[in-house]
């Protein structure tokens, strides 16, 4: 191989190493974002279960049948 070919190959290897380094950083950032989203989703699911449980336990006698309500006043 000539010196020119070797220099081109070395440059190509350096470029590929830079690309891999940037990809590793991007993958790590995406993994961190995904982890945060998973934690947020889990928290939201717990909150939703709590709200649904509260709604199921509500006394249905407190709710007024819309058919029995008087009509709203007309202006």
UniProtKB/Swiss-Prot annotation:
It comes from the Bacteria. Signal peptide: none annotated. Pfam families: SlyX (PF04102). InterPro entries: SlyX. Belongs to the SlyX family. This is Protein SlyX homolog. The gene is slyX.
């Amino acid at each position: 191989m000539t010196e020119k070919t070797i220099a081109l190959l070395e440059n190509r290897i350096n470029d590929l190493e830079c690309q891999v380094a940037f990809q590793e950083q991007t993958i790590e950032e995406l993994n961190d974002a995904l982890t945060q989203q998973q934690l947020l989703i889990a928290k939201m699911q717990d909150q939703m279960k709590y709200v649904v449980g509260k709604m199921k336990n509500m006394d249905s006698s407190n709710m007024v049948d819309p058919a029995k309500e008087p009509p709203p006043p007309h202006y």
